[in-house]
Curated annotation (Swiss-Prot):
It comes from Drosophila melanogaster. Keywords: DNA damage, DNA repair, DNA-binding, Metal-binding, Nucleus, Zinc, Zinc-finger. This is DNA repair protein complementing XP-A cells homolog. It is found in: Nucleus. Residues 1-10 have a biased composition (Polar residues).
Length: 296
C-alpha cells in the first residue's frame, strides 16, 4: 500500500519533466552555459561585499578576503588589492584565536593567508647624522646618501644649473656626460621662458667634487680663473687700441695721407739722368713714389 503511494507521489515531477519540449530544453542548456561563462569571466572579486557579509553572517574576515584577492606586503604590513586602484589594510587576527589555531569555542580557526609578496626594503645610512632611512630626495635623484632632514639644514645640497656650473668651475660637457661616474640631474622648466629648453639641475656638492677631480685642487681652479681673466683683459685692451687707432686715422687725416674715397694721381718732377745705367728717374711731388725708365 505504501509502495503504491510513493509511486503516485513521485509521478507528477516525472510528468512535468516529460512535458518539456526539445526547444525548452535547448534554451535551458544555453542559459546554463551563459551563466557558467559569466562566472568564469569574473576575474576579481569585490572584498567590500565580502566584508559586508562578514558583518551580517559573522564569518571570519581573513577567510572572506582570501577568496579572489591578492595580498601585498609592504614594510611588514599586509595590504589587499581591491582591484579598484587602491589597497586595503588586511584585518588583524581576532584576539579570541589562540596560538594553536583554535578559537574560544574550541573549533579550528580559518588559516591566515601567507601568500603575500615580500618587497625588499633597503635602508641607507645618512652621511651627516648616521640615521638609517629608506627614502630620500637626494638619494632618489642624485644617489647621495643624505636624509631629508639634513638636506634641509645644509646649504651645500642646493641645486645649480649646468650653465652656471660650467662658468663657475670651468667644466666642459664631457666632464658632465662622459667622465665616469656620470653626474645625475633633474630636468625643470625654464622659469625665464617656458618655450626654451628644460634646465638641467645638478647637485652643487657633486659639481664641486667633479671640479676637484678635473683640476686637482682648489688652488689650481683659482689659477685657471685668473689666467682666463687675464686673457679676457688682454682681448679687451687689443680691441680698445684698435678702435683708438681707427679713430686717430679718421681725425688726424693730415698724418695719414691714405684717402679711401679718391684715386691718387702722381705729379712727377723733372727727370734725372744716370749715366752708368743709362736710365732716367722722376719722383712724384706729392708722394715719395719714384719711377725709373729708359728713353729710346
Amino acid at each position: 500500500m505504501s509502495a503504491e503511494v510513493s509511486t503516485n507521489e513521485s509521478a507528477p515531477p516525472a510528468e512535468k519533466k516529460s512535458k518539456l519540449t526539445n526547444a525548452q530544453k535547448a534554451r535551458i542548456e544555453r542559459n546554463q552555459a551563459k551563466a557558467q561563462k559569466l562566472r568564469e569571466a569574473k576575474l576579481v572579486s569585490h572584498p567590500f561585499k565580502e566584508l559586508a557579509s562578514n558583518k551580517e553572517g559573522g564569518t571570519h574576515p581573513e577567510a572572506a578576503l582570501s577568496q579572489g584577492s591578492s595580498v601585498i606586503k609592504v614594510q611588514g604590513t599586509k595590504y589587499i588589492d581591491s582591484g579598484g586602484g587602491f589597497l586595503l589594510e588586511q584585518p588583524v587576527m581576532p584576539t579570541g584565536v589562540g596560538p594553536a589555531g583554535l578559537n574560544k569555542s574550541g573549533e579550528e580557526a580559518p588559516p591566515i593567508l601567507d601568500d603575500a609578496i615580500a618587497i625588499p626594503v633597503q635602508y641607507e645610512e645618512c652621511l651627516e647624522c648616521g640615521d638609517m632611512f629608506a627614502d630620500s630626495y637626494l638619494f632618489n635623484n642624485f644617489g647621495h646618501s643624505v636624509c631629508d632632514k639634513c638636506r634641509d639644514k645644509d646649504e651645500r645640497y642646493a641645486l645649480i644649473t649646468r650653465t652656471e656650473a660650467k662658468a663657475e668651475y670651468l667644466l666642459k660637457d664631457c666632464d658632465f656626460d662622459k667622465r665616469e661616474p656620470k653626474l645625475r640631474y633633474i630636468s625643470r622648466k625654464n622659469p625665464h621662458n617656458v618655450r626654451w629648453g628644460e634646465m638641467k639641475l645638478y647637485l652643487h656638492l657633486q659639481i664641486h667634487q667633479r671640479a676637484l677631480e678635473v683640476w686637482g685642487s682648489e688652488e689650481e681652479l683659482v689659477r685657471q680663473h685668473e689666467a682666463r681673466e687675464d686673457k679676457r683683459e688682454e682681448g679687451k685692451a687689443r680691441k680698445y687700441n684698435k678702435k683708438m687707432k681707427q679713430l686717430r686715422m679718421e681725425v688726424r687725416s693730415s698724418i695719414y695721407t691714405k684717402k679711401t674715397h679718391e684715386v691718387h694721381e702722381h705729379e712727377f718732377g723733372p727727370d734725372t739722368y744716370d749715366e752708368e745705367e743709362d736710365t732716367y728717374t722722376h719722383t712724384c711731388i706729392t708722394c715719395p713714389y719714384s719711377e725709373t725708365y729708359e728713353k729710346m
